[in-house]
Amino acid sequence: MTDAPVISPIDQARILSEALPHMQRYDEETIVIKYGGHAMGAENDAKAFARDIVLLEQTAVNPVVVHGGGPQIATMLKRLGIKSEFAAGLRITDGATIEIVEMVLAGSINKQLVGYINEAGGKAVGLCGKDGNMVTASKATRTMVDPDSRIEEVVDLGFVGEPEKVDLTLLNQLIGHELIPVLAPLATSATGQTFNVNADTFAGAVAGALKAKRLLLLTDVPGVLDKSKQLIPELSIKDARKLIADGTISGGMIPKVETCIYALEQGVEGVVILDGKVPHAVLLELFTNQGTGTLIHK
């Protein structure tokens, strides 16, 4: 690891001065940040992310953090001798698995991230979509083509949910009051059943309900790539749909982009897919001229 470059006091002042108009743009605005399990990395990376979130709050931005936890769930399931199974990019979640998912997301990752933010000087509040019936969901359904028969079949994903409604009562008590909501992507059904919700989908639903200024999806790739594997810095909804249709956007990037489109259609001003492993990725996107990742807009 190389030492960080030394920045003179004058250059530090210049950087802060150049950030001012960007800070003013997001003054008192709500930014929803999805912090993916793959983006979390080592403890030092998570603590650096937490400090950046506190900095946002200190500059009058209202951050709302939604975290994932796929790798951490997989590690716990493996430790307990439970096989991880996926269909259509979603974890098949049976009765035993949903208990472990809830334990890891709401009990471990959530409280750890809350601790890091509080350690950095913030006031984080750890919640999940079940708290206050914040996010209600219904059972998710997916279809897949059987490779042998070529017949499309419905896949039973178990306790995997799709958000149906977001109740902002609880979040509105926190946002704008120097409190930073940290949300685990769990939801409840109308009958009280716990559902595991894809973190991107959960973040998109929350951002849409809040009419957030920005939704940032932190992942482990630079953003949306073209067929030459070069970053596409900006896309409209129309452009994004074309790239899905022609196969440029494929695999796991499709549901991420579909989440972006949904959030935009619900009133979010802009959505960015960016590499959360880049140091200070959130600050680079919000407070610099060039930004980072792929911005998707109407």
UniProtKB/Swiss-Prot annotation:
Signal peptide: none annotated. Keywords: Amino-acid biosynthesis, Arginine biosynthesis, ATP-binding, Cytoplasm, Kinase, Nucleotide-binding, Transferase. The record marks K34, K256 as: Transition state stabilizer. Its EC number is 2.7.2.8. InterPro entries: AceGlu_kinase-like_sf, AcgluKinase_fam, ArgB, Asp/Glu/Uridylate_kinase, NAGK-C. Disulfide bonds: none annotated. Catalyzes the ATP-dependent phosphorylation of N-acetyl-L-glutamate. NCBIfam families: argB. This is Acetylglutamate kinase. The lineage of its organism: Bacteria, Pseudomonadati, Pseudomonadota, Alphaproteobacteria, Hyphomicrobiales. The gene is argB.
